[in-house]
Amino acid sequence: MPSSEASPAAGLSEDSTRHLPRILCLHGGGTNARIFKAQCRQLSAQLKRDFRFIYAEAPWISIAGPDVLAVYGQWGPFKRWLRWSPEQPDITTQETVKELDQCLARAVEADNACGTTGEVVAILGFSQGAKVAASVLYWQQRSGQSLGLRASNSGYRFGVLLAGSSPLVDLSTCEGDSNGLSENAWPGDDMIGPRALDCDTHKLIIPTLHVHGLQDRGLRLHRALMEDFCAPESTTLIEWDGVHRVPLNRAEVSRVAGQIRKLAGLTSNS
């Protein structure tokens, strides 16, 4: 079993990271916050002097995601943000938005209780978490509301989307303004259906970094999220020779970390 409890900011005390800007992290479907913290260990280590990472836990119990049991089989319970199997019960848009907001807020508030003062400046997600992260950014762009953040925070300035699939999901809770959540939550599934947002009229302009594994079976859908739903002038792409996982190789992680620093600088309020 891999070691999980080592701090992602090894070499720095907790006190020394409390002032840093924060990145809110959303795990993939069929995993959980503890697993995602382990999966992000190299990235958080390379950014330990720049950002404090906080990890949100999805609201609904799930079966384990693809390839999760082989490494993290004893790390349950596993959670999901959206339906990713036809056997899972459907959830109303209103219920999903409420639970999503509460889960993100809980993670931020728990970190606030540690005495942190840094603003939450970005949202990062992997797989289903990236799909949700992009949708949260779009909802902020459309409504001016930042799910999970309260009045003291000015909103997410950028997003980091690791292997996120098309399409965006509609988080609008206004009856008549939404057909509900996207039904395209299954990895590699082409089903779009009436609940998906139309890429011709919905473009995310908040800056996003997209990280795509060239051996990932879902690569076509990952490219579609970037090309069809994100404005080209606000996107940055990193491709790496990997499958559907968070990069761990030092050189690849260094590229991602460098672009995150760059985005943070470009979107800084100072």
Curated annotation (Swiss-Prot):
State the name under which the record lists this protein.
Answer: Esterase
Q: Which protein family is it in?
A: Belongs to the LovG family.
- Known EC number: 3.1.2.-
Q: In which domain of life is the source organism classified?
A: Eukaryota
Name the InterPro entries on file.
Answer: AB_hydrolase_fold, FSH-like_dom, LovG
**SUPFAM superfamilies (UniProt xref):** alpha/beta-Hydrolases
Task: Kindly tell me the pathway this chain contributes to.
Answer: Mycotoxin biosynthesis
Keywords on record: Hydrolase, Virulence
GO annotations under biological process? Answer: secondary metabolite biosynthetic process
Q: Which GO terms describe its cellular component?
A: cytoplasm; nucleus
The Swiss-Prot or TrEMBL record annotates one GO molecular function as: hydrolase activity
Function according to Swiss-Prot or TrEMBL = Esterase; part of the gene cluster that mediates the biosynthesis of the selective antifungal agent ascochitine, an o-quinone methide that plays a possible protective role against other microbial competitors in nature and is considered to be important for pathogenicity of legume-associated Didymella species. The pathway probably begins with the synthesis of a keto-aldehyde intermediate by the ascochitine non-reducing polyketide synthase pksAC from successive condensations of 4 malonyl-CoA units, presumably with a simple acetyl-CoA starter unit.
What Pfam family is a match for this entry? FSH1
Does the record's keyword annotation contain Hydrolase? yes
Active-site residues, Swiss-Prot/TrEMBL: S127 (charge relay system), D216 (charge relay system), H244 (charge relay system)
Q: What organism is this sequence from?
A: Didymella fabae
